[in-house]
Amino acid sequence: MKKVYLLSLMILSGCLLTAQPQQLISKIAFGSCASEAERQPVLDLVVKHKPDIFVYLGDNIYGDTKDMKALQAKYDSLAAKPEFQRLKKNVKLLATWDDHDYGWNDSGKWYTFKKESKELFLKFFEEPLNSDRRKHDGIYTSYMFEGNGRKLQLVLLDNRTFRSDLRLYRGELSRNEKYFYPLDYYPHEIEDSTMLGDTQWKWLEEELKKPADVRIIGSGSQFGISFNGYEAWANFPHEQKRMLALIKKTKASGVLFITGDVHYAEISKLETKGQYPIYDVTASGITSTWLFATPNDNRIEGPVMENHFGMLTIDWSKKDPGLKMEIWDVKDNQRIEHTISLSEISFMNSK
């Protein structure tokens, strides 16, 4: 009886849900940009496709407030949706945030209520009470899935809590016809700004040192695109270079990004000398849409402008596992399929 009681206490306190390796998975669904005020039929399609996990990549609600009661009410609205309840019942949910659920459009480290917002986020996604996420600033975290001699690492970054102010656009590219729309931001030219902050960077280095065959890095902001004047890692080119240098330094093969934010889907391929290509699969539009896709020199698939979700499927049965990247739209049409072999994103094949 004492053992049963102790086990119950451990479950309630989250002790059984610490960052221990979990069973190997092969199907990862993901998406972002979901207004709690709208129907979300995409979520029922996610359930239909039977992924092992679903990763929320930010703008999971549209908070945009400094009133924590209002932010909680928006989480309550999402929780009450039948389609969200079906998703939660059938698929394991993991999440990071972006600006709107963090609290304010395009906000970074100066958002006043980031600690209070964090508590609401962790409560909504049922973070274990003893989770490391509750012990440090921000919500960055990682998971390891393993079995049959293979390992998959999922890293979820926090690109809000520590991010420096963006540099405002002041007409520097006004004569460039490539940018046919109003730009908001321009890349930082000095390296005194940050996306992740020193503590998160140090943590990430230790994570990338861990053995893994596939490493999926989730970021609310797009990583692999070229500059487009909107929010992205490209506004912090020194931080983008730091990420690539860190991947190379730690010899972390198998890295692939999943991102959100922009209200359309695409796949970007970022190629640099002496390093394998970094793929970035953007799935952004559970409910949100945009009028156009911005220029992206690194785009190899897309864009898909209709509501959608993303899927990564790993074929572990092969000696050289296949990685299939997909985008499925709200009518359950496969709009993008792009498959690579794991060896293609390995330092063994870098040039």
Per-segment meaning from a language model:
Residues 21-351:
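Long, structured stretches of catalytic cores involved in phosphate-ester chemistry, encompassing
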Residues 1-23:
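Bacterial Sec-dependent N-terminal signal peptides
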